[in-house]
Amino acid sequence: MIELMRARYDFRIDGRELIVIDDVVTGARMENLASFFDLAPAQRIESDITGADTRLWIIPIERDIAEKQPYTTAIMSEVGEHFPNETFTLERAYCNAIAYGDMLYAHRDRRECESRDVTALLFVATEWKRDWDGETIFFNDDGEAMHAVSPRPGRLVLFRSAIEHRAGAPSRVCNRTRLTLALKLRANR
């Protein structure tokens, strides 16, 4: 049996890893995940920056429930492969639900620049067109945009949580919510 290689891209921003892996979740699993989050009740409680009046829609996931899900197993397998000499504990899990017109800000998931923590973002969709926009932009420590990662069904982005980044809102022509499953992983010391 021939195993197909998935597309993978490795970058470094100020010495911190940013890894993009395609097709981590596909087929029926992606369809089920997308259907679930499309219908799940969201809460407008999240903010990209401290003190912001804007709130973003998220679908919280209890940690003990997230740990038992096939998507978490697939993501953690990739984390283990790409960070082989490190171990992580799932600290938080939720799905971002971003729509046209949402205001998003550049932020770091961990403010400490030396943090070894990792954020995993899985784009949850059965289809995403290029003209729908929604790219995630990654910045260096000087605030310069260094990489843009396009949303793509089943695409996983692993990055050190200290990398500043900003999610992109979908364009006006997009009739869907941009869903990204986020796992915040604490590095075990």
Briefly describe each language-model feature range.
Residues 1-86:
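Non-heme Fe(II)/2-oxoglutarate
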Residues 77-189:
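Catalytic core of non-heme Fe(II) oxygenases with the double-stranded beta-helix
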